[in-house]
Every structure is written in structure tokens, then in C-alpha cells.
Regions:
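Hydrophobic alpha-helical membrane-association signature
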Residues: 34-37, 87-90, 234
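Glycine- (often His-adjacent) and acidic-residue-rich active-site loop
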Residues: 58-97, 113, 141-143, 226
């Protein structure tokens, strides 16, 4: 299967389906359409007997810059919900699809990853990244809460203190730091990333899908309840903070091209 929409490219070879996020001018930031298309593509791959493994990457210099802040600001200004607390929003559709995806998921991080561009890696079975990749979870700098059960999955991957820094600091993490923490499995030169990730995905895809599914289920099923509980907590906290003083200041600062001033906000914000 080869199918290219404007924002998500799909290509099959050797039982590996490669999904390439294709909003390079927006650094592959997730708007509602990309959330929905990637969720649908994962569901389709899960049901397709010709697919054994999915490989996810991005076009251009970014893996994904996270949620599209322009769209978030428009939703907040209009009194809407940017998604983490809304069942029908594409964000939750994507997280549902990631949780339900029962085949191996390989990520090839081709550049920077922010927000959901980091937290979705908690659902990947193997993560490859270029040596120049960088990672950031900017939740506190946006005045919001974690997402996608990252408050549970990231500590599972990297340990409590590393996770606390990643989730609380809103600072960049280098590819080398991500590898040392356990967020990334292999680092590659940029020109070798896709060949390396594809080679490993193809080796997995040559094995019985039934056995691959069984291994993944055995590894993930013990965590299912805690992932669901983490999502509920995060969605509630995200909804409470979205459109609040800190989030409004962060979005205003982004629109105005300045640093946010959280110190001047009311106590407790």
C-alpha cells in the first residue's frame, strides 16, 4: 500500500508500513487533521494482515513540534478545548490508537521532538534518533499538565528523577541524554537513520505476527490499568489549566514573540 495525503505519507515494503508525518513547514506539529489521520492510519495498520510492523517518522528537520500552538490559541480564544480533555478530539483518538496498537511500533526521530512528539515515544517499542535530535516536554512552560499518560510512561522508561526533570523543566534534552536515560534505543547519523530503523523493523516483520502480538501484549497488559488512570488524571488537570492565567500568558507570549512572565501571575497560577 502506498497512499499519500497532504499531511501523512503511507508506504509498505516487506510487511513494514512506514508512516511519515508531512507538515515540514509547521515542523510536523499536530493539528486536528494530523491527529485524526495518524490515528486512522494506526487503526488501519492494526487490522491489515499484510502489515507486521509500523515505522513512524517525520518529513523535514523535525519529528514533531507537538500540538499546533496556533490552533490551540484559536480554540482557547473561542472558548473551545484543545483536546486533552475532550473525548472526540483527534488527540484522544491518537492516544487511543497508540494504546490499542498491538503490533511492534518503531519510531525514527529525524530531528526535534516536542510535547506529543516526545510523549508518543512512550508507546513505541523501539526508538531510533539522529545524533542531533532534541527533545522537550514544554508542559510547564505552556501552563498545562502532562498528556498521553506520560506521567506514568516516561518514569517507566527513564526513572523518576529523569522523568521529573523532563516533565517539569520544559528544557531541551539532547539525543545523547535521551539515549542515556532510556528514552531512545539507538542513535544514528542523520543519513543512516531510516536505513537503520527500517532494517530493524524488517527483521521484526519477518517473524510471526501472532508471536509479535503475544510478546507486545505480555509486555503492555500489566500496565494497562495504570496507563488508563494516568490519562484520566492528566486530562482532568489539563482541562483545569487550559485557558487559565498561566496558559493564557504562555500563548500570548508565543503570539507576541516574547518570554512568558509567570512571576507576575496571581498566587497559585
Amino acid at each position: 500500500m502506498t497512499s499519500n495525503s497532504e499531511i501523512l505519507e503511507v508506504q509498505d515494503a516487506d510487511r513494514v508500513r512506514t508512516l511519515t508525518m508531512n507538515r515540514p513547514d509547521a515542523l510536523n506539529a499536530f493539528n486536528g487533521a494530523l491527529y485524526a489521520e495518524l490515528a486512522a492510519a494506526l487503526r488501519a495498520a492494526a487490522e491489515d494482515p499484510a502489515v507486521a510492523v509500523v515505522l513512524l517518522t517525520g518529513r523535514g528537520r523535525a519529528f514533531s513540534a507537538g500540538t499546533d500552538l496556533v490552533e490551540m490559541a484559536e480554540l482557547v480564544a473561542g472558548g473551545g478545548d484543545a483536546g486533552a480533555g475532550t473525548e472526540e478530539h483527534g488527540f484522544n483518538l491518537l492516544v487511543d490508537a497508540l494504546i490499542a496498537f498491538g503490533k511492534p511500533l518503531v519510531a525514527a526521530v529525524n530531528g526535534l521532538g516536542l510535547g506529543i512528539g516526545v510523549t508518543l515515544l512512550g508507546y513505541a517499542d523501539l526508538v531510533f534518533a539522529t545524533e542531533g535530535a532534541r527533545f522537550k516536554c514544554p508542559f510547564t512552560s505552556l501552563g498545562v499538565a502532562p498528556e498521553a499518560a506520560s506521567s506514568y510512561l516516561i518514569p517507566q522508561l527513564v526513572g523518576h528523577q529523569n522523568a521529573a526533570w523532563v516533565l517539569m523543566s520544559s528544557e531541551w534534552i539532547s539525543a545523547q541524554e535521551a539515549r542515556e536515560m532510556g528514552l531512545v534505543w539507538r542513535l544514528c547519523a542523520p543519513e543512516d537513520l531510516m536505513a537503520e530503523a527500517t532494517a530493524h523493523a524488517t527483521r521484526l516483520a519477518a517473524l510471526p505476527v501472532s508471536s509479535l502480538r503475544a510478546v507486545k501484549r505480555a509486555m503492555t497488559e500489566p500496565h494497562a490499568r495504570r496507563v488508563a488512570e494516568a490519562r484520566q488524571r492528566e486530562n482532568r488537570m489539563f482541562a483545569e489549566l487550559l485557558g487559565g492565567p498561566a496558559n493564557n500568558e504562555a500563548l500570548a507570549a508565543f503570539a507576541e514573540g516574547r518570554r512568558p512572565d509567570f512571576a507576575s501571575l496571581p498566587d497559585g497560577s
